Amino acid sequence: MRRRSTRTATIFASALLLFDGCRDKLPVAPSELTTGIVIYQHANFLGESAHVAADISNLDDVRGPCVRTESDSEGNTSSKDSWDDCASSVRVAPGWRATLYEDPNYKGWAADVGEENVTNFQLVRGPCSRDTFNDCASSVRVFRVR
């Protein structure tokens, strides 16, 4: 019975993030992955992680481990920590797949992730650093395939 309540809690938390406009932070990675994907800050499933069980149109809206500092025209700086351009590896739940996109709103270069994990996005061709998909994802769609 515990497995069912964990799955329900994860789905409920993802729904709140998507539909309630409360997209502060994604749920942490579950010990047993049964839905969606888990994105990791570093290669080989290291660093901070987050469970993604529903589509996210803009990873910049989700608080995460990567910090971006911006300056306005008056020289004022601000920083924002998010998951935008931050994923370096992905674990996929059995029966699920995902597409990670270079730009928000599911646009730009796309990296399809099947039922096999990606241990290092530096080994996946893409438009970002050194022509790879490392630290490149800005939106993600997840799909149940069975």
Model-derived segments and spans:
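C-terminal motif of bacterial Sec signal peptides marking the signal peptidase cleavage site
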Residues: 18-21
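Alpha-helical transmembrane segments
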Residues: 13-16
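Bacterial N-terminal signal peptides that target proteins for export
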Residues: 1-11
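Compact beta-sheet-dominated domain cores in extracellular/mature segments
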Residues: 23-146
